[in-house]
From Swiss-Prot:
Enzyme Commission (EC) number: 2.1.1.107
Domain of life: Eukaryota
UniProt keyword terms in alphabetical order: Amino-acid biosynthesis, Methionine biosynthesis, Methyltransferase, Porphyrin biosynthesis, S-adenosyl-L-methionine, Transferase
Protein name: Uroporphyrinogen-III C-methyltransferase
Primary role: Siroheme synthase involved in methionine biosynthesis.
GO molecular function, one term: uroporphyrin-III C-methyltransferase activity
The protein's enzyme class: transferase
GO biological process: methionine biosynthetic process; methylation; siroheme biosynthetic process; sulfate assimilation
CDD domains: SUMT
A single Gene Ontology CC term: nucleus
Family of this protein: Belongs to the precorrin methyltransferase family.
C-alpha cells in the first residue's frame, strides 16, 4: 500500500480513546425489533467505562423488563419510561456541565426518522457527540468492534472498516487477537508495573505533574498518555556508554525499558524484572558466568575511543580430566523474513542447546527456536551496548565450557557491521573456533525488497555499503559522491541529521533520490522515498521503525512510477507499507529433507 500524504482521503474519522468516567450517556429508544442486544451492548460498554447510561423512551415494555432485569442492580443505570423530549439533552446531564448530556445514542424505529433528524441537529448545535443506529448521516461518531482483555490488563483492540463491513471488521479483530501470545495479559500488566515503578523511583519530584512536562514524556520513550505522540525518530539516539551525563544516567532505566518493549520477544516480556537491568548494566554486579580473570573482551571501537578500561570476563573453571567441549556457530538470520533464512541457519537453530540472539532478530525468526532450547537475548540499549556484549560473550563461553552447542544468532550477516569478526577472535582465543554461516545482509536484501535495483545498466554500476556511525559516535569517513553508485548506509537513521549534513558538506547532491527502508521483509516493512536533502526532516515526520537502512542513488526510483516521485516543498516523501510476498511453512519444509 502506497501512502501519499497529499492524496490521503480527507474524510477518514479521527480515532481516539475517550474517557467516560461519571459522564451521562443518553440512549434514546431501544430498537425496533424484539431483540434489545444492541442497547445492552452499549450499556455494558458505558458502565465498563465508568459512565452513567440513561435510557429514554424504551421501544416496548418487553425491552424495559429485560433491561431492568440485567442492569437494575447498577446505581448508575436509569430508565425513563416516557417519550423523548429535546429538552432532555439539556436537563438530564451533570451539574458540572450545566445539565447538558455528554453523549447520545439513538435507536428509534424507521417511522421516527424525522425525530432522529431533529435530535441530530440539536446535538450538533450543542456540540454533543451523537450516534444514530444505521444512519451515518445523522451520526458524528461510530462505535467500533472492540476486544477488551478479560483479565483486566487494560489492553483494548478496536478495528473499523469505516462502513465497509461490520462483519469484516469483527473478523479482522478476531484474526489480530488470535495472533497475540497466550500470555498477553501478563505481558501488558508486567510492562505497566515496571513503567510505574520506574516513574515512582526515578521521577518522584515530577510525579505530581502526571507525565506532563516530565522526563517520561521526553522524546524517544513513549510513556505519556498519548500513545501516538512520542517522537520515535529519537528512540535510538546515540548514547556514549562511558561518557553519559548525569541526566542520561538518571534516564538509563527508562531507556532500557523502552528498548525491551520494542525489541524483546513479546511472549518473554511477562518475565522481565528490573533486576535484569541491574545485572546487565552495573559493572559491579556479576552474573553467574562473570568474574574477573584474565579473559578479556576483544577491543572495540567504542571502548578504545572512550579510553575506558575494558571489563574482563572469566573463563569458567574447567574440571580436571577429559571433558566434552562445546561447539559454537555464528549464524546470520537474514533481514527478518523466515523465507530469507538459509537452510543451514535453520538447521543450526533447530539443533542448538542454547541460542544467543541479537535484540534485532525479529519475532518470526525467534519463533522457530524449539521451546526447550535456552534462549538469551542481548540486553543492548543505547548506553549499555558494551556491557551487554560482554555479558553475552561470557554466557557463550560458560555454555561452551559446559559442553553445549552454542548458536550466536545475528541479524543480517555476521560480518557486515555485525561484530562477527570480533566474536570469532574472542572464542578462538579461548579455544573454540566458530563455524560461520553467512546470512542475507539487509544492506543488499532491502534494496530488492524496496524495488530498488542496486545495479542497473545506465543507472548504477557500483554499490557501496557504509556505516552511518563511526568511532565514538563520530561521522565515518565520508565517501566521495559518485552519480552512478548506489550507497547503502546502515546504523544511520538515528542520526540522520548529522550524517546528511556531513554528506552535503562533502559535495553530495542534495537532490539525489533516497529511500528509508525499515524492517525489511517483515509484515510491517516500510519504504519511504524522498530526496537526500529532506531525509532528516522526513525521519522526524514519520518516526522510527528500527532496524532500517538508508539507500541513496538514482537506482532508488528506477522502477517507480514517475508520478509518485514528483517531490516538491509541499510533497516531500511517499510511503509504501507492508510486505507479504513470501510465506514459508517451516515444518513442511523440513519434511522435504
Amino acid at each position: 500500500m502506497v501512502r501519499d500524504l497529499v492524496t490521503l482521503p480527507s474524510s477518514l474519522p479521527l480515532i481516539t480513546a475517550g474517557f467516560a468516567t461519571d459522564q451521562v450517556h443518553l440512549l434514546i429508544g431501544t430498537g425496533s425489533t424484539d431483540s434489545v442486544s444492541v442497547c445492552k451492548n452499549r450499556i455494558h460498554s458505558i458502565l465498563n467505562a465508568g459512565g452513567n447510561p440513561i435510557v429514554v423512551n424504551p421501544s416496548s415494555p418487553s425491552h424495559t423488563k429485560q433491561l431492568q432485569l440485567e442492569f437494575g442492580k447498577f446505581a448508575k443505570f436509569e430508565i425513563v419510561e416516557r417519550e423523548f423530549r429535546l429538552s432532555d439533552l439539556t436537563t438530564l446531564g451533570r451539574v458540572l456541565v450545566c445539565k447538558v448530556v455528554d453523549r447520545v445514542f439513538v435507536d428509534l424505529p424507521i417511522t421516527q426518522s424525522r425525530l432522529c433528524e431533529e435530535i441530530f441537529w440539536q446535538c450538533q448545535k450543542l456540540r454533543i457527540p451523537i450516534n444514530t443506529f444505521h444512519k451515518p448521516e445523522f451520526s458524528t461518531f461510530n462505535m467500533i468492534p472492540t476486544w477488551v482483555d478479560p483479565k483486566g490488563s487494560g489492553l483494548q483492540i478496536s478495528v473499523t472498516t469505516n462502513g465497509n463491513g461490520y462483519i469484516l471488521a469483527n473478523r479482522i479483530k478476531r484474526d489480530i487477537i488470535s495472533h497475540l501470545p497466550p500470555n498477553i495479559s501478563e505481558v501488558v500488566i508486567n510492562m505497566g508495573y515496571l513503567k510505574d515503578r520506574i516513574i515512582n523511583e526515578d521521577h518522584k519530584a515530577l510525579l505530581e505533574e502526571k507525565y506532563y512536562q516530565t522526563d517520561m514524556s521526553l522524546p524517544g520513550f513513549g510513556y505519556g498518555l498519548d500513545e501516538d505522540g512520542w517522537e520515535s525518530h529519537k528512540f535510538n539516539k546515540l548514547i556514549r556508554e562511558f561518557e553519559m551525563t548525569s541526566r542520561e544516567q538518571r534516564l538509563k532505566r527508562t531507556r532500557w525499558l523502552s528498548q525491551i518493549m520494542e525489541y524483546y520477544p513479546m511472549n518473554k516480556l511477562s518475565d522481565i524484572k528490573l533486576e535484569d537491568f541491574e545485572t546487565s548494566s552495573s559493572p559491579n554486579k556479576k552474573t553467574k558466568q562473570e568474574t574477573v580473570t584474565e579473559g578479556v573482551v576483544p577491543p572495540t571501537d567504542e571502548n578504545i575511543e572512550n579510553g575506558t578500561k575494558q571489563l574482563q570476563l572469566s573463563e569458567v573453571k574447567k574440571e580436571e580430566g577429559p571433558k566434552k567441549l562445546g561447539k559454537i556457530s555464528l549464524v546470520g538470520s537474514g533481514p527478518g523474513s523466515v523465507s530469507m533464512l538459509t537452510i543451514g541457519a535453520l538447521q543450526e537453530i533447530k539443533s542448538a542447546d542454547i541460542i544467543l540472539a541479537d535484540k534485532l532478530v525479529p519475532q518470526a525468526i525467534l519463533d522457530l527456536i524449539p521451546p526447550k532450547t535456552e534462549t538469551f537475548i542481548a540486553k543492548k540499549f543505547p548506553g549499555n551496548a558494551e556491557r551487554a556484549q560482554q555479558e553475552l560473550l561470557a554466557k557463550g563461553l560458560e555454555s561452551l565450557d559446559n559442553g553445549l552447542k552454542v548458536v550466536r544468532l545475528k541479524q543480517g550477516d555476521p560480518y557486515i557491521f555485525g561484530r562477527g569478526g570480533e566474536e570469532f577472535n574472542f572464542f578462538k582465543d579461548h579455544g573454540y573456533i566458530p563455524v560461520v554461516l553467512p546470512g542475507i545482509s539487509s544492506s543488499l536484501a532491502c534494496t530488492v525488497l524496496a524495488q530498488i535495483p542496486a545495479t542497473q545498466r545506465d543507472i548504477a554500476d557500483q554499490v557501496l555499503i557504509c556505516t552511518g556511525t563511526g568511532r565514538k559516535g563520530a561521522l565515518p569517513i565520508i565517501p566521495e559522491f559518485v552519480e552512478s553508485r548506489t550507497t547503502v548506509f546502515l546504523m544511520a537513521l538515528h542520526r540522520a541529521n548529522v550524517l546528511i549534513t556531513g554528506l552535503l558538506k562533502h559535495g553530495w547532491d542534495g537532490d539525489v533520490p533516497a529511500a528509508i527502508v525499515e524492517r525489511g521483509s517483515c509484515p510491517d516493512q516500510r519504504v519511504t522515498r524522498t530526496l537526500l536533502k529532506w531525509v532528516p526532516e522526513v525521519v522526524e515526520e514519520i518516526g522510527s521503525r528500527p532496524p532500517g537502512v538508508l539507500v541513496v542513488g538514482k537506482a532508488v526510483n528506477a522502477l517507480v512510477e514517475k508520478d509518485l516521485i514528483n517531490f516538491d516543498e509541499s510533497r516531500k516523501f511517499v510511503i509504501d507499507e507492508g510486505f507479504r510476498e513470501f510465506e514459508v511453512d517451516v515444518d513442511s519444509l523440513f519434511k522435504l529433507y
